[in-house]
């Protein structure tokens, strides 16, 4: 949430109790962008002040996500690097009469905080003797200390209009072993107490935070005032101190960015995990097939302001389309197949047709796709009694088969329920792509795969996770807002052999359908593809 500019470099700080989402990506792009602009280096700092919510899994995934976005950091730091200094600073504050041990319950402390329009009530322990406070603070950092039995609070101003100034908690007891320091510590600093001081210790010049940290800024400054007093530099308060600056966070329509709600989605198995392709997490977007360049392009387009805004998911998807159009390999896949038999094509004969990998980039070359008598086409591409403006396959009309021949439909076969099981057509032998006969005007072009030279595949389609534009602002239980149609599975699709060999990380365009990527579940025997985004924004049309 907070990001640090240091002399000749930038500091990016992250909580290590969850996975990064696209909102974090906006901050990361700013940090590394500033470092690049001023020929500096970006360092990372992990806020590991709450061992009960942290583990190395989160650290490893955060580092992977930052690398995937295309950034390289300088050094990696942890708030735990400064636990000794923070402890000494807290002891100094107690000795100066600026901090005390409070043995009230969390509920009692919250009740005594008051409201924004009424002052708080002083704790009965506020004027506890300094020596007693020091002894109890030492007791907090023992294995016998009971979580919630006491906290260290700063003695500031219980009548201050800023609620964060009303004797904030500096330390609490946590008996969970720390993933770096083990059982050395049993009392841990609060984030508000640790991050400003860590900035000061590192020589950070500016702390760039999201807008919810605006009311925290006076407290950030106050603790640094105390720290400069401890260091004997209180006479020059404005020298060599970090300053906090805020910018707006990234919010997207039809999803949530709240870490609590994202945890809830995962814990209640409402999604398949943190990398569910419907999630706004970077690992989810990567699995779905979003490119890091498209995410950075989107973030650059919305900019940084002082006003919170709700950004349309369609803008992000437009950036994804724009980027993938330049890099995705074009392949053929049939999601809802129906058999097409070319009745006048020689039995047992095949041809290798040349297919351009990407018309946007000639250097990507070509591949071959096998053509034969028996093909699969999309069921929706055939209509027996078609309206005038239906330019796909219908009896008596010609269509072009992509990269192959012009064919004319001659009829179809149905089962006892009237369901079409086979379509028949005749091909024009001199209309092959590249031949002179292929130049005649035919309005419809269909994609296809050879029935004997394709691979059966599973295709997963995703849509908006929530039905409402701004679920975070809706007062209803967010379970009621989930989109029941956000996931569809198509287990009986067919893809050309060239597509079946593609791996996660390789961008594909299923021609006339959309952009896709092989899923982590994909195998050579049963390829699995995730739909990244359609060629057009169908959601907007559905919800007009």
Regions found by a protein language model. Give the residues of each.
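Short hydrophobic "helix-edge" motifs at membrane interfaces and signal-peptide entry regions
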Residues: 10-12, 181-183, 279-282, 502
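Short beta-alpha connecting loops at secondary-structure transitions
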Residues: 47-48, 205-208, 280
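N-terminal Rossmann-like or analogous alpha/beta NTP/dinucleotide-binding catalytic cores
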Residues: 1-122, 212-242, 251, 256-258, ...
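Long, charged, mostly alpha-helical binding arms that flank functional sites
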Residues: 239-319
